[in-house]
Amino acid sequence: MFALAAACAWGAWSVPNDAAQWFLAASGAVAVIAGTDRRRAEQDRERKRRAAETPSGVYGTASFMTGEEAARAGLTNPAGLFLGALEGRMLFHTGKAHCISVAPARSGKGTSAVIPNLLHSQASTYIIDPKGELAGVTARHRRETFGQKVIVLNPWGLHGLPKHRFNPLAYLIDIYEDETIRRGLTEEVAALALQLVPEPEDARNKFFREGSRKLLRAIMLHFASRGRPASCTLPDLWRVLQNATRMDETLIEMAGSDALGGVVADFADDIARTLEKNPESFQSFIEGATQAVSIFDPAGWLADSVMASDFSFGELKTGKVSVYLVIPPDRVATHGAWLGLLTRQAITAVARQPGNTPVLFMLDEFANMGKLAGLSESLTLLPGLGVRVWIIVQSLDQLRTVYGREATNTILSQAEVQQFFAVQDHGLAKMLSDALGQRTVKTLSVNLGRKEDDDPGESRAEAARPLMSPDEIRLMPTGQQILLIQSHRPIRAQRVPFWTVAPWCDWAAPNPVEGAHPRPEPTYRLTYREKRDD
């Protein structure tokens, strides 16, 4: 049409006849208008075609974060905790809130999450260390490179590592002897008893559990107030509960005590009355209390490690300290209460120290510690005190079994970073699929007509599709992970073994269980300031 218009314009200029010139000019104008309309129609069709092929987002706009977006969001700042890599960029999180990692056993949590952060983070750190691998690989580095004091609680003497001690009852004497805080002693003892005899979700038999806790509270108050620090220990508590003669002698001592305004004597009177009027219930209380401290019997593995203290958990806040709790993997299920008792005390001690100096708790085998009394409630307060908890579990079902559904949901809501990989449980895969959200996709329908010679017709529609289906999550490659970070789009990131990062690969000592780690050419490099002795 535009060519015709040009020809008409040339003809109108070159033809001398006025009528012909007028006709050619009019024809050219008509051609221009027609051409413009045709071009506009073509553009309109193209616009509609693109609109038909572009999802509207009406069902959702979920998508994964890109590497550039991660950099703009501050997730590549090495001042934070290490998470993985995305499009060649190492990912870190500098927030103050907590983290949780969910992955099955032998899936690489240690090599791609725990060890990297023990080699990277210079904050004081408390580490649960099944097998002693974490201390074996990272303790020397944290002592020599970061200049930290290293404590290894290692009752079983694994791998020739140090065998430091911590007495969980010693601080009760400190409270009793300090008149300014003595009134808090009964609350401390009650919290200890609740940790030793936790309250499960199933509230049946609560009467007997409370009876056992009352017995523990009474004896611990007596231990704290009688002025014999060397015998204020869990093995001594076991001796009293286990031996009827010692129990009688202890009750006589308590009855004559004026400590705490007569509270200790009142406990003795109450216990004696229960023993006289309801001996069967009293025997149940004794059995429950004895069972709670049975792992601390004087002939057991833990006895020496809890008889005295070589350090204070408060040092985690006031200095630069790394504390490793080493336990054989086959003892986690039977002696996990030791981990739980010390972990609760460590968190409490650090939270009570002034200031907000950062302290990291790396809690592997978290569900096997037993229930940490009050943890789900205190998680909301700890970030403001500089305390960050990284919980590591094999499945969310483990958490629900120990803490119940409501408390588990609270723990998850307080985890600013949620890390998942090697997912095989369908329930977890479904939960993750829902959490990732939905996106809008275009669907194409083809109508072949009723007759063989009918032209096929096409129609487009929109539908909702999960960003990843449960099956796609379960079939993710081994080296990939899903990161859910509060206020950010989800990230499908790479897991990064510590030996692929310089200088981590040089800092890590050989694994005392599996030997030397691989030494490929590093994929990533970080730069650290030299340690200063000031």
Regions found by a protein language model. Give the residues of each.
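Conserved ATP-driven motor cores of ASCE-family P-loop NTPases powering translocation/secretion/packaging/pilus
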Residues: 379-485
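Short, flexible active-site loops
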Residues: 2-7, 325-326, 361-363, 414
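Short, surface-exposed polybasic-aromatic patches that bind anionic ligands, especially phosphate groups
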Residues: 497
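Short alpha-helical interface patches
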Residues: 44, 50-77, 237-244, 313-316, ...
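P-loop NTPase motor domains
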Residues: 82, 90-96, 100-389, 403, ...
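Basic- and hydrophobic-enriched, low-structure N-terminal and domain-boundary segments
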Residues: 1-107, 111-114, 159-162, 168, ...
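Glycine-centered flexibility motif
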Residues: 84, 193, 227, 395, ...
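Short intrinsically disordered, low-complexity coil segments enriched in acidic
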Residues: 2-7, 429-432, 520
